Structures are given as C-alpha cells and as structure tokens.
Amino acid sequence: MAERGSDIRPGHVLEHNNALYLVVKVMHTQPGKGGAYIQAEMKNLKTGAKQYERFRADGDIKRAIVDESDYQYIYGDGSMITIMHLKTYEQLTISKDILGDKSIYLQDNIIITLVFYNGEIISAKVPDYVTLQVVETEAVIKGQTVSSSAYKVAMLENNQRISVPTFIKPGDRIVVYTPDDSYYERAKG
C-alpha cells in the first residue's frame, strides 16, 4: 500500500529495495533550504541489520500489508518455544530467536504478537509492559541524597539487571517497560 513519507511511524513494515524493513525510529527534518524529509532507522527483517534511510516527506513509500495474531506462550524447550493461538487454540513451535533480546521476558501465559507477511512469520513482539519480581538489589548507602543517585541496580527473576528507585527492595514486584528495558513503576496489588 503506497503512502506518503510523512506517514511513516515506528512499528510500520516497509517494502524497500526488495526487502522488508521494520521502522524502529523516525525523525522529521525541515531544513532551511529544500524539502522536508524523514530520517528513519530501520531493521531488515531477514538479516536483522540496522539501516538508516531518508525519505522525502511528500514522496511515496510502500508499506507492506501484514497480519498480526496474538499467541499465548506455553513453554520453552532450549532454543524453541511453543505458543498457542488465542482463538483457534492452534499450537506452533517457533525459534526463540524471532524475539531477539526480548526473549528474556518469556514467562508463563505471556501474550506474544506474531507478525505475518504472505503467511510467513517475519517478527514477534512481547507486551510493552511486563511485571517481574525483584530478586536482589544493591544496598543503599545511608545519607545518600537525591543530588547523588536516586537509582540502584536490581536483579529481576529473569536474571535481568535494571536501574530501579532506591525504595525498591527484594520481593517487590515491578513493571518493566520492554521497548527500552527500563523500570516503569511498582506493581499495584
């Protein structure tokens, strides 16, 4: 489907130079001289290579027509995971590599969104927000003030280390923002 360059958004899948690219980041630029353009950071879905491309804001781009389906994670077996379609209950076994570094968030019953192009899986996404338990944290030095650091490093149940506020302690459940692997808030309830 053809669209204008100014319509590019993160998450779109584009057909460009005979390959499929996932748009990761977009920056609109209006130079003092000449026409506006879009600087897009894209990831080649076949090779995983990152690429930067400029598109004219009023130029045409070709957006790939993709289908998305939600699947529930059932279990992992080494480098493979088994997931189940939420409506048809069909089970698939796919490579964990399709999730890239986000496979660290796999836990029982998490919902994974698979992206299909011409019936073939081209990418997968975990939810933007995942709740995890803090296993251990660094000790806070008494007298530490806001002017120094208001954060400390915490180890989560999935063996991931992230920065959390100093009031977080082992046993707390926190919400992690998965696109940038950062602390979002303490889990409610």
Swiss-Prot record:
One Pfam family matching this protein: EFP
Coiled coil start-end: none
Keyword NADP annotated: no
GO molecular function: translation elongation factor activity
GO CC field: cytoplasm
Metabolic or biological pathway, per its Swiss-Prot or TrEMBL entry: Protein biosynthesis; polypeptide chain elongation
Keyword Chaperone (UniProt): no
SUPFAM superfamilies in alphabetical order: Nucleic acid-binding proteins (SSF50249), Translation proteins SH3-like domain (SSF50104)
SMART domains membership: EFP, Elong-fact-P_C
Keywords from the named record: Cytoplasm, Elongation factor, Protein biosynthesis
InterPro entries in alphabetical order: Elong-fact-P_C, NA-bd_OB-fold, Rib_uL2_dom2, Transl_elong_fac_P/YeiP, Transl_elong_KOW-like, Transl_elong_P/YeiP_cen, Transl_elongation_fac_P, Translation_prot_SH3-like_sf
Any GO BP annotation: peptide biosynthetic process
Family in the record: Belongs to the elongation factor P family.
Summary of the function given for this chain in its UniProt record: Involved in peptide bond synthesis. Stimulates efficient translation and peptide-bond synthesis on native or reconstituted 70S ribosomes in vitro. Probably functions indirectly by altering the affinity of the ribosome for aminoacyl-tRNA, thus increasing their reactivity as acceptors for peptidyl transferase.
Classification via PANTHER family: ELONGATION FACTOR P, TRANSLATION ELONGATION FACTOR KOW-LIKE DOMAIN-CONTAINING PROTEIN
Identification of the protein by name: Elongation factor P
